[in-house]
Structures are given as structure tokens and as C-alpha cells.
Amino acid sequence: MYADGKLIYQLDAVPGIWGNTPGWTWNIVRFSSNVSSLQVQFTPCYPETAGQQKTFYIGGGYNIYRGVMRRAMPAFLISMMVILIGLYISIYWIVIRCGSRIDGTLLYLGIFSILLGTWSANETDVATLLLTNRQGCSYLAFATLMLLPMSCILFVKSFLEIRDDWFCRIICNANLALIVLTHILNATEIYEFRRSLWMTHALIILMILYLLVVICSKIARRQLDQ
């Protein structure tokens, strides 16, 4: 950022284990009210991030901070509730599992809730403002998103008593292979997490299509409880 042609702020992408990115972060820059012109220059870390919309706030730092936190807090609290519900369900399954033989439906639901809540909470502005390790948070977002398809499909398969093991196993194995592959590509700096995100999205779409077909099939066969 330049104020009247003078450089006053700069944020560089530092290569690390999380990737060549500063992470999704807020940049707070203080400058004099006497400044007549400001120039902001962006250099995308990856081609995929070029052209993304940027939001600017001008005013007192405290008022901006309070306004952003107030708007983002409801979504953050809902995400935290989802995490707590997932933890409760998982612990409950572990406790009752010791005394009786039950399937893993509740455990899969608990894990899925924890992953979904963690991912959604990490995407809010509350997490962006409070958590300082933005590279680590960026990795957390990718990791939880990559784990979501497998946990979701295991829950639905167990809950609906889906007997199709073949295609379900293919999706789960593809999910595991994707996790290993993307971590190797990121570690070797061949293809970092941000650039391989489309693979995770493709797997999620495949999972959704599979679940829709299975649910519609069970409805058509009147095997789904009303």
C-alpha cells in the first residue's frame, strides 16, 4: 500500500509447510488523515485467486473491528454449537458402545458435525480476526473440507442402511487417495492446496450425486421411513 507514493504497508507470501500463501487475513493499515491519495497493489499468490473481490473499510479501527465481529458472531456461534453437538454425540457413542453392540451411525454423525462446524467456524471473520496463524488456518480449512465427503457418506450409508458397498468404497478410497496426493503435491510444491481445491470440490459433487441417487432409489422402492 502506498500513501502519496510512499510505501507504508507490505504483506509478503512466505513459503512454508502450509503453502506459499499468507493465508486469508485482515490487513489493518494506519495512515494519517492528511494523506491525499492511496494506492493498493495486489499480487496473487496463485492464478486461481486473481480477480477475487476485495473489501475495504475506512474509519476508526475499533468501530470497524466491532462491526465486523457483530456481523460475523451469529454464524460463528452456530458453528461452535455444531462442533459441541458433534463432540457430545461422539462421546455418547463411545460411552454406550462399551455396554452394548451398536453400529457406527452416531459416531459418523458426530465426526461429520465436528468437521463441518470446524470448517464453517474457520471461514468466519471472527476466526480471521482472532486466530493469528493464518497459514495454519488455511490448511485447517483445506484439511476439514477434504475429510467431509468420507464422513458424510459413511453416516448416510449407515443411517439409511445402504447395501451398496462397492461404489461407497470407491468414493472413500478416492477420498483417502486425494488426501495423500494433495499433501504430497503441496509438500513438494508441485501443486499446492489452493490450486488442488477443485479436486476436493469434484469429489464432493460426486458424493452428493451418489447420495441423491441412493435416496431417490430408496424412496422409489418405499424403503425410506416416512
Label for each model-derived stretch:
Residues 73-226:
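Juxtamembrane segments at transmembrane-helix boundaries
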